[in-house]
């Protein structure tokens, strides 16, 4: 305690000593959770991590953010301490933790545990307006991957094959929280919710998504995500939403609509008109999007438009910012 983490050699020696004690008498080390010195409690956490003792979960309730952070790392990282994982996952219920490293591990702990109640916890956390916005978005992205999690850990990048889960588990929690999520005060959360609906092919939100897609007061990113989601779930109002988005003031929204229309109805007459408008747009992204969509079409009209662009390139009249897009 008197060293107070100042001498790293003493600190390391102390950790090794505590780990040795913990192997013989874990209770002796666990009792340090009540010690008044933060440095002692930190050393206790590191020692418990070395011996893989699940009692380290006690330190998740510590008053020191450093200690809680160390405990979260101990439970989650490297080879982990599986028996303590539920305690880490449960931190999302508390509402008192604001540390991003801790919350990321708590979110991922729920993904790794993979039970229906863990999916529900992620949705509840994402719907909580007082939680950090970035972490609410992370919870939604994690929920989006629920049926088939990526094999590289979302926090560490370590290989972890979590297998597959029924997509219905994610659908069930969205049934209960979709209203809160799509009406959130956070634009980022609403956008992430729309993306989750797309990835999970969740079909019970079409009416709400249509309202988002047509709401001119919202950002283009949210409206574009809503249109994408309507297309992904093949909602009844998807074609109408795409048609409305084609006429939007936002180039981002128009570009999204053109891309979706090319997938839904590549022979639509308004598609070629929109692509021609996109090529003449003052916005680079819309021009690039139009070229990309043209490259995916096989109609004679599309080929003709592309040939016109390659001729511009050959003559040196095409903007330098579009050279690569035309060649591709």
Question: What is each stretch, according to the model?
Answer:
Residues 99-102, 140-160:
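HEAT-repeat alpha-solenoid elements in large eukaryotic scaffold proteins
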Residues 124-125, 138-145, 163-168, 173, ...:
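Extended surface/linker regions that mediate inter-domain or inter-protein docking
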Residues 13-20, 46-50, 74-77, 105-112, ...:
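Core register positions within helices of long alpha-helical scaffolds
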Residues 1-2, 22-34, 51-61, 80-94, ...:
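Amphipathic alpha-helical scaffolding segments comprising HEAT/armadillo-like alpha-solenoid repeats
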Residues 1-15, 69, 94-109, 165, ...:
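Primarily the internal scaffold of c-type cytochrome electron-transfer domains
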Residues 7-8, 38-39, 65-69, 96-101, ...:
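Alpha-helix N-cap/helix-start positions at coil->helix boundaries
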Residues 1, 186, 250, 325-328:
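Short, intrinsically disordered, charge-balanced linker/junction segments flanking boundaries
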Residues 8-12, 42, 69, 100-104, ...:
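Alpha-solenoid HEAT/ARM repeat scaffold
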């Amino acid at each position: 305690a008197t060293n107070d983490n100042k001498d790293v050699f003493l600190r390391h020696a102390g950790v090794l000593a505590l780990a040795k004690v913990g192997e013989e008498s874990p209770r002796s080390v666990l009792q340090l959770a009540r010690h008044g010195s933060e440095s002692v409690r930190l050393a206790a956490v590191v020692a418990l991590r070395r011996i893989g003792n699940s009692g380290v979960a006690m330190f998740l309730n510590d008053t020191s953010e450093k200690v809680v952070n160390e405990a979260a790392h101990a439970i989650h990282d490297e080879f982990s301490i599986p028996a303590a994982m539920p305690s880490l996952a449960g931190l999302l219920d508390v509402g008192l933790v604001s540390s991003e490293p801790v919350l990321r591990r708590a979110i991922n702990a729920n993904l790794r545990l993979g039970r229906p109640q863990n999916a529900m916890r992620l949705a509840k956390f994402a719907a909580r307006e007082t939680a950090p916005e970035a972490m609410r978005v992370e919870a939604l992205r994690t929920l989006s991957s629920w049926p088939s999690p990526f094999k590289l850990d979302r926090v560490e990048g370590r290989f972890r094959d979590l297998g597959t889960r029924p997509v219905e588990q994610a659908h069930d929690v969205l049934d209960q929280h979709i209203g809160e999520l799509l009406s959130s005060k956070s634009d980022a959360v609403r956008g992430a919710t729309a993306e989750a609906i797309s990835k999970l092919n969740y079909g019970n939100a079409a009416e709400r998504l249509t309202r988002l897609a047509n709401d001119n007061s919202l950002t283009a990113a949210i409206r574009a995500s809503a249109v994408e989601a309507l297309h992904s779930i093949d909602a009844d109002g998807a074609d109408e939403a795409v048609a409305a988005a084609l006429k939007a003031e936002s180039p981002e929204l128009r570009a999204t609509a053109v891309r979706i229309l090319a997938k839904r109805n590549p022979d639509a007459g308004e598609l070629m008109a929109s692509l021609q408008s996109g090529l003449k747009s003052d916005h680079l992204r819309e021009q690039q999007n139009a070229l990309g969509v043209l490259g995916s079409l096989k109609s004679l009209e599309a080929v003709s438009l592309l040939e016109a662009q390659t001729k511009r390139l050959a003559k040196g009249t095409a903007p330098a910012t579009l050279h690569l897009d035309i060649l591709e």
